[in-house]
Amino acid sequence: MKVGVLLVTHPGVGSAMLHIASRIIGRTTLPIKCLEVPTDASLEPTMESARSMLEVLNAGDGVLVLTDIYGATPHNLAKEVACNQPGTTVLSGLNLPMLVRVFNYPDDDLDTLSSKAAEGGSRGIMTCPLQSVGG
């Protein structure tokens, strides 16, 4: 069994991240789904979709839920649904380095995968010194 991964994001973010990560790393063996939450979405049907996806993804090893913006509607919805799902971790601040890290460690347990995802996301953010290529 493997940890499931659910991306809960604003429209276009999760699907684009999955597409790009798949192009960089290749297909993942992790069960992974994406729920994109429109700003005008009805909350209860969207929460039911999230619950259903979590149940499908959790084959016993848990689910890592990745959200794009802490405190935004997709994150709040994911957090609310995850509260009633044992073995679920919610991690906010989704970026491409975070998702690539998840793709790179498909056999890790939930706690380890969550830590590696957070580390990958954090290490992928840096200020780059500016200098010309020629010196």
PLM segments and residue spans:
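N-terminal loops that bind phosphate or other acidic moieties
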Residues: 2-135
